[in-house]
């Protein structure tokens, strides 16, 4: 009654708005740490281990607007890296369970051992931030932080993508990360925007 549905079909998810979404995503990312020139990724990089269930979750990239978005249209970090680096092998592993945060270290280590660099996605799910989602403890999940620590034992460069809708505490993993990007939830073009930033 109050919307022009035909106009909505033409505008929502149009190429122009997706380009704007990608651009605003790039401008929203905050570089918190970058040691030993971990970023941008070296042109010589040929194998990336992408670890962390958030890196392959379309719904979580929309944050607390997830119920209003079109999940199938979201570009995950996994998709974004493969598009941005077509000549690079991207080996993905969950690393942890999205629901329970139980660690899946064996598959994460296997992917990490085959890589030149490790990119780890940690943080909050779509339903953990937003209106009426206050928390007494804003520390990144202990198992997710432990995952970062364990992956650093490979001796490889570790880049952390910190996702969520609020500032978070991550003292336990910080010493084990060579670079940390606060990527928030960047919406439909999340994966493309993040891939642009790290390249």
Language model regions located:
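C-terminal non-catalytic regions of proteins with extracellular/luminal or membrane-system context
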Residues: 3-5, 11-15, 19-199
